[in-house]
């Protein structure tokens, strides 16, 4: 009867957790003996009930959820859509993986929650349901893998495998699913032998660190403790954690409530007292921990607290260090071996959602949000501050919601939302710890790499080829095969990215080249001129700065004859390009030099200089200055010799002296000419000028002598003096009455007539007075008297492109370049095409700059090239040649497998194509052709690229404009918009039509060189099947080069340079992204080992450094530099220890394992018990860099006057194992020879205070019953010392008497 009054009656199902709680309360109330009898009765009752029920588990008891298959099917469809988005470049690999994990986790959780209600409705006595629900065997996750889906698994490195297991153990797994499942299983294909060894090694290191810690004293006398507050933890799970932390501890200070003491110091905390603290909402209580124990190599009873075995204070002599190491290592071993753990995806419910309660229009402040991209690649907004959201249905219903800061908003302002539509997400709890992860993306194709904007062109590292992005950017790999012949090919092209059509012939065929091959359309004439490539020299620098608005291309030319004709509105100009060479060659012939100036926009306006002609005979042979004579057709160059020296250089000649040629100026410099010397200073340099010529002294001033004037050859200057093409200059000396003149030699140049200059262009182009024509004019270097240096071009002939302005419409000229080289034959062609701006729908905006590369025209005929090596390749290859690593014999071939052709209008219903025209009624408008050329069209269809499916009708009504029927066609142009007009019999005025009226029927622009994504719609019923680049446009089809787009987010790293050749499998992009730490210890305890070894990437180590910096700033301002540093160090170490314990505890708690924090604190205490000496102020005590105990450093610091400078050191468990008081224990752990040799040199003494060293030497261990023997041994030694001191004192006292 007494027993019934003391125990409450529980009328509920007893799960494993409830049974553990019952046993704990029975032990607290009745003790161990009575509790054992009660548990025996429960055991007998359980066996009887199991025998009467006769439950058995069969395969028929496994009931699968009926909704599994349609959920999996829907998931596959969403996965297919995400994969298409990834292939199109809208999502990158990380976002695709995140979407995959999120979808399958949602599906798995839905099936898991649906499983148990089904058991309750169908059969509540199902053996599987009762077994897992009661906690007797199995849990929800394990039953879910039996009946639902296995889900996503991780590989041996802990990364998620992106192929989910859709089957379960009831249905069976396929071979692929079994291989993936074995990664997370205990005995599969991937064996756990290595992981078992790692787990055992972790336990061994933990025991090695704390094996010497034994309870040897009741109280150490400390007054310090750590504070724990229950106010911070309001939810039930956190309250249970608070009770687990303080139960079994000892109070470090009295606890008061309203001046009434409810617990005293050194009182152990029972379960009842802990609940009382929780219910009374105590602010904070101070408890004793192993961190605050004063003992050196042991621990006292009160700092340890109660024993976990009998729930009383720990007994003296208990080896708590061994228990602590085993309690941490053994759960990790079990989890690693998958004894009671199943693999899966770690996730947490940390996101809350807000959905629309009804249909309505949403309103919020748009200034409080900014656009961003979610982790899954979806567009969204982020709240800068708290955001109020209002949903109004237009009637009486109004809903108000509040989103906290940093929440996601998935709708726009004033958007209409439907009921249950997702509006936003916010975090419901504190976010988990994150870690930075690198994700590498590799190329799937061979080809060229290209990107658009938002890529920094400066290299991330000087010695590397990595570029970082500052915005979302698409990276394209243009397909192409890399060809490396065994012999050196003889037809390298002069520039990269030139596209030609090549027929590879046999090696026996001779070089064949047809100069009359037509490069353009049927109504045009091509100019081609074969020329043997001359020897190249280094290009000389020009003094003028380059124009940033144009591209200057140096061209090396030779006079030759050109035959051909010019078409209206189109001009072709051939030229030859001379690349720069570093090696010096033989002296080249005196050929003119030409610089082609092409605007970056690709367009020329009227009266614009497009080419500068430099004749080498008009280059200054030496320094000097220019002077213009009286004749307008001549100018002269007065040469002089100039030298620059340092101010400290010794000069052997004097100023205003006259020297001869080869006179020594300095020790290493001689003059080349003779003449008058002029020396002056210029900033930090000394300038020495030698004016060549000769002096003429005269006594009487002759009026014919003029200062700085020209004199003609054989001119009489008086006194029978005749000049010979000299420059006349008088020089007066002030100290002499005589004067003299300096007659300097001048080089005379004749200004050429522009019409007489022999330029390499066709003479007909300069003489014909047509719409397009080229004008020539001379440009001089500068005014008279301007000084110049050697190699300056004195006269430049400028070629100006011009045309007649026919009407008020503005015009401009587009430029196209074609360059081909076969062996030593170089063919370069520039094409100028006149274009006009009109008001029609397909005209572009004025001065629009095309960002696309200018492509050469499509070749109408296939040119034949020959090889000098023995190579045979398939014919009709369209190749884009790119050199690799400066190796000329390697190039990129664009074969038919890298391209595909799209035929336009294949799906039209009307297949009766009529390509007719009415020659009697021409159209006076100008239409744009394929290659950006304007045509004045009289016969519409032969000269413009239209495909018509309806009869053509043209009627001319008046002079100002034309009205005609719109055919069912569209215009495709390199620069213009692509418009489609499907309506028939619609009359329109092209000069009055505006762009916005036809915006609904307009399709995206397609240009040559344009990059297009997969499923890009080119018309109503046509789309691209794969991503690629348009490389050719024909009347009936497009040729598209295969390409693969990759999306790179901001702060990503791109490996490689623009237009670089990439092989399949080469790294392209490196993503830096954050993911939540799973704290999974199933792969050899990586997280626990990372924390225990105190690695540099450990978040605890990083937080300690950051906290010290913050505390040091605050304490220094309050207490000064010295005390601030001391206090901040102490606070930082205490907080770091507590944070260390919390992190290790979270790892185990995530797997459902709880470890007593006292055991973790013992490990952390040993890891933080060493300091590093940083200064050798006290000699012969410690060496700089020596590791010593913290308590020892504090004792010596108090004993000496001068302070010891040291800093705290966080040691990993492996290094802490080599820094113990016993060298015998260290030698038995690792590196036996090194440890024993070092101990012998240092003369270390092992006092045999630990367990391990006594076991090695076969002594009685100082724990348990052996503690008395150890204590008596130390007591006898202490009494001997005292007796020795007493005898010595008595002896001294007798001698004094």
Swiss-Prot record:
Gene Ontology annotations of biological process type: DNA-templated transcription
Annotated compartments: Plastid, Chloroplast
Gene3D superfamilies associated with the record: 1.10.132.30, 1.10.150.390, 1.10.1790.20, RNA polymerase Rpb1, domain 3
Disordered, as annotated region: 1278-1297
Needed cofactors: Zn(2+)
EC code: 2.7.7.6
Chemical reaction(s) catalysed: RNA(n) + a ribonucleoside 5'-triphosphate = RNA(n+1) + diphosphate
Molecular functions (GO terms): DNA binding; DNA-directed RNA polymerase activity; zinc ion binding
Annotated coiled-coil segments of the chain: none
Biased composition (Basic residues): 1278-1288
InterPro entries cross-referenced by the UniProt entry: DNA-dir_RpoC2_beta_pp, RNA_pol_beta''_euk, RNA_pol_Rpb1_3_sf, RNA_pol_Rpb1_4, RNA_pol_Rpb1_5, Rpb1_funnel_sf
Self-association and partners: In plastids the minimal PEP RNA polymerase catalytic core is composed of four subunits: alpha, beta, beta', and beta''. When a (nuclear-encoded) sigma factor is associated with the core the holoenzyme is formed, which can initiate transcription.
PANTHER family hit by this protein: DNA-DIRECTED RNA POLYMERASE SUBUNIT BETA
Protein name listed in UniProt: DNA-directed RNA polymerase subunit beta''
Lineage: Eukaryota, Viridiplantae, Streptophyta, Embryophyta, Tracheophyta
